[in-house]
Amino acid sequence: WVSGTYNWATMYSRIRSCNVALENIRTATFDNQALKDRLSGEAHFLRGYYYHQLVRYYGGVPLIDKSYGLNEDYTIARSSFEDCVGFIVKECDSAIALLDGVSMAKGRATANAALALKSRILLYAASDMHDIPTLQSKTSFLSGYAAPEVLGYTSGDRIARWQAAKVAAKAVMDAAGSGYKLGLNAPVTTEQGKNNYMSIAMGGGSKAPGVDASAASEIIFGR
C-alpha cells in the first residue's frame, strides 16, 4: 500500500517545515526552555521520520537540514544510503534526549516513538537488502548501476550493523514494554490468536467480538 502522503514532494515540504521550526525555536524570545526543548524534540523526530519514509522508497536522498530562500541553489546531490541512515539515527537521538521523561498527549512524538523509529531504520539498514556486496553476489541486477551507494552499504561491518539494530530494539522494548500476548511458550487457540492480532493491529479500537481494548497501551506512536 502506497499513500500519496509518502511521495517525494510531500515529504520534503514537511521536512522544510521541520527545518523552519527548528530555526525559529533556536531564536525564539520566550523563556520557557522546557517548551523549547519539547518542540525541538518533536521537530527532530518528525524530520527523522520523514527522511525514513523517503529512504524506504528511494534509498539515499538529498539531506537538507535548513530552510532555503528563493535565490539559493537547489541542485543538491543525493546522499549515500549510509549517510541518510546516520542522519536519521542522529535525529532520533536528539529527539530521545529532548523528550525523555516528557509526558505527551496522544498523537504527539515521544522519546519512545523516537526509540522505535531508530530501531526500525537500523533494522532495515542491517538487512541483506541494503548490503551491496551481498546483493551483488546474488544477482546481476546491480552490475550496471553507477551509484550503488545510494541503495545500501558498499562496505563496512555487517555484524556491527546487526549489533546496533539489536541494541536499539532492546532499548525500545525495555522503555516501552513489550510482548502483548505474544509469549511463544503459551500457545493459544486459533480464534484467540486472531483476537490477539486484531487487538494489537487495531490498538484496541476494533469493535469486533473478543478484541481487548487494553491493547491501546501498546501503541507507541499514532494519531
Give short role names for the model-derived ranges.
Residues 1-58, 72-108:
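Conserved, well-structured interaction surfaces
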Residues 44-47, 115-121:
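TPR/Sel1-like alpha-solenoid repeat signature
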